[in-house]
Structure formats: C-alpha cells, structure tokens
Swiss-Prot record:
Residues 1-26 form a transit peptide. This is Alpha-aminoadipic semialdehyde dehydrogenase. Keywords: Acetylation, Cytoplasm, Disease variant, Epilepsy, Mitochondrion, NAD, Nucleus, Oxidoreductase, Transit peptide. Belongs to the aldehyde dehydrogenase family. The record marks N195 as: Transition state stabilizer.
Amino acid sequence: MWRLPRALCVHAAKTSKLSGPWSRPAAFMSTLLINQPQYAWLKELGLREENEGVYNGSWGGRGEVITTYCPANNEPIARVRQASVADYEETVKKAREAWKIWADIPAPKRGEIVRQIGDALREKIQVLGSLVSLEMGKILVEGVGEVQEYVDICDYAVGLSRMIGGPILPSERSGHALIEQWNPVGLVGIITAFNFPVAVYGWNNAIAMICGNVCLWKGAPTTSLISVAVTKIIAKVLEDNKLPGAICSLTCGGADIGTAMAKDERVNLLSFTGSTQVGKQVGLMVQERFGRSLLELGGNNAIIAFEDADLSLVVPSALFAAVGTAGQRCTTARRLFIHESIHDEVVNRLKKAYAQIRVGNPWDPNVLYGPLHTKQAVSMFLGAVEEAKKEGGTVVYGGKVMDRPGNYVEPTIVTGLGHDASIAHTETFAPILYVFKFKNEEEVFAWNNEVKQGLSSSIFTKDLGRIFRWLGPKGSDCGIVNVNIPTSGAEIGGAFGGEKHTGGGRESGSDAWKQYMRRSTCTINYSKDLPLAQGIKFQ
C-alpha cells in the first residue's frame, strides 16, 4: 500500500485548498459540497455538514474535526469529528460488553444478521457507491463494485455460518473422542486504507461476525464519510434486531487511535491494511503483547507475457491492472515483463490503448480513469517518474500532471530500466508501469520473485507445462498466482493476501475464517478406564 509519513494514520487528512490556476474563490470553497443541490443525495446516507465519527451503540466523538475533500476537484465535502483516546476507551469497553451477548447467539442466527446487513447494503448500493467515487476518487463502476464486494462476502458468510467447525478425530485410546473446538477470538480491530474504504472492512467484518466476534473499525481519515455511512447502515440492522450497536463499533481517527488499537491487549486480533512501512510497526506492537495480527501490506505486482501469449488478452489486462483505480490498488500491476520477441509490439499496442482511456469526473459513468486520492500522491508520482529517468528509464507515455482541477496525473509507461532498478523495486501508489524485456522462463520467474513484496502475479501463456511450473514451488512466490488474467480483480471466494513483506495475512474466502477464531483440542473420556496416551503406564 501507499507509504505514509505518520505511523498508523494510513494517510493524512487534507487541510489546505488547491493552489493553481483552477483555484476557486474563498467564498465558494467555504461551501461544503453536501450543501449543494447536486449532492443532496449524500443526505440519503444520513450524512450532514458535521458528522460524529464514533459509534458504540450511540453516536459521538470528542476529537479533532476534519474536513474530507473530493479528489476530482479538491473541494470540501463535509466534516467529521474524530475519536479522542477517551472515546476509544469507552468504545472498547462497550464492544467487550456487547461480545458477551453476541457470542451466545448461535452461528446460523449470527449469519441471519449478516444477511440483513447485506440486504441493507444492496438497498443503498448506488448511493453508497457514489460516495466512494466522490470521496475516494475511484470511478463510479468501481465504487459500486466495491459495495457489491461487501454484499457478496455477506452472502458467503451466511453460508459459512452453518459450516464452521472442527473435526472429530480418531483417538488412539478406546472410549475416547478427540475434538477440535473453534471459538471466537473476541474483539477484532479493523484498520482499513483509503483505496478500498468499504470492501476491506466488509471482508473482515462479515466473516468475523459470523465467527462470533465483535468489530472495532478505524477507517482512513480521508474517507471518514464512507466509514460513517457504512456504520449507519449496519447500526440500523443491529438496532432493528434489538442487538447492541457496539457489536460493530467505529472510531474515526488518526495515528493515536491506530496505535492504541495495536497496543491494546483487549483487541484480540488486529487486521491492518496499509503500507509495508507502517505494517511493520503494527506487527511489532501487536507481537510485543503476543496478540494476533492480520497484515495486508504492499504489493509490487508483475505480469509476464511469453512469446506464445494471446496479445488480445495481454494488452487489456495490463491496461486494467496498471491504470485501474488510477494505480492505487494493492494488486496494481507495476512491472510488465515481455518476451523480447514481442516486446515492441506489446508496447506499441499499450501506448495506443492508453491514448484511448477516457479521463474525467469519476462519477461520470463513461469515465474509466479518475484522480489520485491526494495531492501528496501526485507529488509521489512526480518523484517516481524523475527517479525512473535518473536510473535510465525512458517515459514512452505520460509522466506529467494533467492541466485540470483535481489530483489527475497521466497514466505512465516507462521502458529501458534494468529489472533490478531500485525504483522498480519500490511500490509507488500511482499509475506507473515499468516495462522490461526478458529472454527465458528461468530468468523472468526469478525477476518476478526478487522484490520484497509477494502479493499478486500473473503470466500469459498457452504452455501447460509452464503454467504448472508457475504454480509450483519454483514458480511465483506470491499469495495470488494468476494465469491469463490481470493481477487485480480478486474474487471473494478465494483467500486474499500475500507473502514476504506483504504480511502473510489472508482475508475473505477459503479457510480465512480460521484467523478470526481460536482453536482448542478437546479429549473426552467417555469410558470407565483411564488409559494414558502413548500407552504410558503410571501406577
């Protein structure tokens, strides 16, 4: 994920007005978007000029008031009052009390509550997706799709609520049963990043809930309105079912709240999505108290196109993986390795495809490419482009800031770098694609694996043997290993996460539910004898 200067803040809330030829008069800038007629739909989500950013059964907040901005024009949307440390303490206590009620509810009935949450999200999918587009900056279809991911994981969790459980194992002693018992860990803290302000919370929240846990969420400060809106939807479901709202608590805040969560022994599992740099600090703080952490950190993902690749698949896949969400996905393709025999043709096709990308306001349904999330991200983009040039790279497409309001940069292609160039080994959260030539399978598999991160990877080939070598022990060392599809766009049915400096955590489908539970091995003697294990006699 995107590197940040302040630990656990995930990214800082913007406070200054946009400078430049498109600056608006102060009187206009003082008008929040939520008060303008074209944004009246925000109030359908229960939002207003100033919103309370703490929920633990009731709404409140005694911390700093921040303003969130629209990345497409850098105009203020609305304000959110963040949590103070005292708010955090109160919320944790209420969440722990709520757990005593929630843990006693049978898992299938917990699944019914999660089903209702999914249905409530369905009802608000368009308006909530529009808020994601407005506050985060991703295009509308991606904003709606992100809410759909939360809906989908709710559906998945409902089914899982009737299936979670451990096996009965054969005992070596007659008259004995050996059972694996799974119980909820208790309180799950969830710290999410700006780039997926709905879906990542959903992956964690839905599964954690059916496992019998309560959740405490700290979203990114710059997407605080999304955190508030989602929590309002969930809170209504809980309140309608006469359940404690603190089952799904919210504490909007920055580094102080994130640090408190990481150090708090009452937080039994902390799920953190963010940069590798900050994730290391989180991991150390949690490990120092022997807690559990689920880390989903950086990705420096590669696509490999072999000489037998279907170029009608390679080009659109590389395009979507590199510029989707303006290069701000953790699964964004940042490195493209092309066999030397097809390198020039693929680069030329990519340049033509890049020239056809429709740029504009992200909530316009015809737009495919929106802004970066903050002005800081624009600066990081420019710094990376200059560093690539210094290291011998050639910008063959893009490389500049767009002359328009908002945080828009040109999607960029860089060729000519060495595979081991330091900038190519640095995750820059921006739409920059580094393109390399390779000669053979052995070297390119090694190049894929030589970066510190290990999230997502993909090859394009028709060679069945090569596919299985790619999937095997000497192939990709990533958590997501694809064939003939992009590096981005994971489905909820599979466990999501990566290896090495990506953190090793897994969210969403498969058996990721086990991370939200603790396992006990239970031996039950239902005989009248007392045989010891391994045939030991102790008389």
